[in-house]
Amino acid sequence: MQRPDMSVAVAGIKMRNPVMTASGTFGYGAEFADYLDLESIGAMISKGLSLKPKAGNPTPRIVETPGGMLNAIGLQNVGIDAFIEQKLPYLKNVNTPVIVNLYGNTLEEYGEVAARLDGLAGVAGIEVNISCPNVKQGGIVFGTDPGAAQEVVRLVKKNTSKPMIVKLSPNVTDVVVMAKACADAGADALSLINTLTGMAIDLERRRPVLANVTGGLSGPAIKPVALRMVWQVGKAVKLPLIGIGGIMNGRDALEFMLAGATAVQVGTASFLDPSAAQRIAREMEQYLADHNIESVSSLIGALEL
């Protein structure tokens, strides 16, 4: 048998395999070049970028938990202008699609960051993080309010012709409602899930471990929740889905594809093993070869009930 066909496409972004790196776990890409071949993975996603540089939250802001970790980094980043000037030139020379994750604390901020990216060579697409508080609306998170999420998606769509992936929060009553809202507003693809809100407590000090008190839970602990949400959304909307949440090996990734994902993102695994994304792509291909499966795309949504 020939080598399995590992290629997939998400919203017109063609990838050599379904493995993408999750925003905030892979720096700006160059930081991982010593640990894996950047041209062995499907796509790279940048840290979340805002209009202006952001320092993030005070420390401690990461803590290990059973089956995962909590982070309260606070979306620290260099800002969109510094990314374009200092980070993007390196990435343009890597033959792997670069997707820029962006966020804002106001509707206008989302629109402005998207506009800066429009027409930029070297940016294959954008991923919109809607898990941010709307400072003009009392801090309600965009991604928990269907109306607010739609406003963001519509404005970003208006300001850029790049393919747009919208990253969904799991911290909602019904993820399908949010998925449909984003799809109706013009999203080209959906990625899910972002982190679940959690906290850790230091019993001896009787204080929260994180300076921010709460943080985002990621890692294997959230995988069953993520799989369920991908499956639910896949039945409800006709957009390509990217599965995220606790993917540590090739089998995990393929489970997300059976649930309905076209591609996956590897995040927390990269902290434990900086070459995780490349290894997972290799493990997926090996599974297909071992089971005489010709194409990875044949597994998308192939869950049998």
Swiss-Prot record:
Cofactor: FMN
UniProt-recorded Gene Ontology molecular function terms: dihydroorotate dehydrogenase (NAD+) activity
Subunit structure: Heterotetramer of 2 PyrK and 2 PyrD type B subunits.
Pathway assignment: Pyrimidine metabolism; UMP biosynthesis via de novo pathway; orotate from (S)-dihydroorotate (NAD(+) route): step 1/1
Annotated active site: C132
Residues that hold substrate according to the record: K47, N71, A72, I73, G74, L75, N129, N194, T195
Primary gene name: pyrD
Similarity section: Belongs to the dihydroorotate dehydrogenase family. Type 1 subfamily.
Enzyme class: oxidoreductase
Reactions the enzyme catalyzes: (S)-dihydroorotate + NAD(+) = orotate + NADH + H(+)
Any one of the GO CC terms: cytoplasm
Xref: PANTHER family: DIHYDROOROTATE DEHYDROGENASE (FUMARATE) (PTHR48109:SF1), DIHYDROOROTATE DEHYDROGENASE (QUINONE), MITOCHONDRIAL-RELATED (PTHR48109)
Subcellular location: Cytoplasm
Cofactor note: Binds 1 FMN per subunit.
Classification via InterPro entries: Aldolase_TIM, DHO_dehydrogenase, DHOD_1B, Dihydroorotate_DH_1, Dihydroorotate_DH_1_2, Dihydroorotate_DH_cat, Dihydroorotate_DH_CS, Dihydroorotate_DH_I
Keywords: Cytoplasm, Flavoprotein, FMN, NAD, Oxidoreductase, Pyrimidine biosynthesis
GO BP annotations listed: 'de novo' pyrimidine nucleobase biosynthetic process; 'de novo' UMP biosynthetic process
Annotated CDD domains: DHOD_1B_like
Keyword Transmembrane part of the UniProt annotation: no
Protein name as annotated: Dihydroorotate dehydrogenase B (NAD(+)), catalytic subunit
Organismal lineage: Bacteria, Pseudomonadati, Thermodesulfobacteriota, Desulfuromonadia, Geobacterales
Function: Catalyzes the conversion of dihydroorotate to orotate with NAD(+) as electron acceptor.
Main subcellular location of this protein, as a coarse class: cytoplasm
